[in-house]
Amino acid sequence: MALCYPKMESGIMEKIDPVLTELRAELSAGKYGDDAHFPSEYELAERFGVNKKTANKAVSLLVAEGWLYRGRRGQGTLVAPQKPFPRGQLCCLYVLKNQYQANFLQGAQAGALEHEYLLNYCSPPPEELPDFLKRLENSPVRGILTGAYGELNTRLPVIYIDRIPKTPPDDAFYSVTCNNYQGGFEMMKQVLDRGHRNIVIFFRRELMPERLTGFRDAMLEAGISDWEKRTFFWLEDSRYEAQKHLRQALKKYPGFSAVACGSDPQMFLTADALDRQGIDWRNRIALTGFGNLLGMDPVLPVASVDQHPYNLGYTAAENLIALIEGRGGDIPRQSMVDVELVNTGNIPFVPQS
């Protein structure tokens, strides 16, 4: 059964927030005994320097969250005899498109539950985001995880997924990301170590740029200086873009033996485009991606980078809870999760001439 929370205006919430933070901390620490009488709204108003209406709304929220309960007539408000569940609520603003996002969400949920928090998943249309954020601020949600909406204009604490901080970094900017540079560099090294030099790159500007930087540095290290000319930027993940850029790559670099893609969706579309061109690429052309959407036993002879999205989600939830509970100094501003190359045995060696 869904809980009903009192509706709050943003101005009232700004006054209530510090009151709630202190009272939650006291209740969590066991300052009040089980079933003990909780201070009256009048006492709270006097203590925190707010009016009685604000104090009453704070108590109503604590009741809705399970910290307190209303006694029988004349008993007043009493302290719940055990720690409430949930201790708080988080919101994940994300777009579920594939297994990567699903695994991330599972990890975030596990991280939240480990600390007695509940995770809500929401995917509002971008044009509705400003109003949605205001509604979240006036709800029991105490923090946000996001990876699809850019930087948010909200007073709630936020953990950003797969985003790098601004320069200079914002004091309020915290992120969790995988080591995209490591993945790009190590995957390109695997391609190069098998003798490939006629290499093309398919990428999108919306992807993490560190992946491309990793590709670049490995190619430069191998003496391939025209890496930028060999990079083809797609406008979107579509069959049309794949076929268009494959034709361009074949024209500029005929006989290329490897395609390094910035994501697994690009890799899948490239495989389809190669098939449609009638090119016998399997075990001849190296094809790599990023995301490991096929798992350890792929149906295509391709290699990819496992970003460990479950671990990312779990870490993001733990870091967000640390921010909510005033422990921001205990976590890094940018948490980095190592990646893992998978199915590199599918990268063919260049035949010796």
Briefly describe each language-model feature range.
Residues M1-G49, K53, K57-S60, P332-Q334:
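Extreme N-terminal segment that seeds HTH/winged-HTH DNA-binding domains in transcriptional regulators
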Residues M187-I224, G329-P348:
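An alpha-beta-alpha
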Residues P6-K7, V19-A25, G33, E43, ...:
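Alpha-helical recognition/docking segments in bacterial nutrient-uptake
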Residues A112-P124, V200, R216-E241:
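Short beta-strand elements in bilobed, periplasmic/extracellular small-molecule ligand-binding domains
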Residues V19, P165, D171-I201, R211, ...:
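Hydrophobic alpha-helical segments within soluble ligand-binding/sensing domains
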Residues C91-L93, P140-A148, V200-R204, T231, ...:
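Periplasmic-binding protein-like
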Residues H37-S40, R70-P84:
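Short, Lys/Arg-rich nucleic-acid/phosphate-binding segment
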Residues R247-S353:
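Flexible loop/turn connectors
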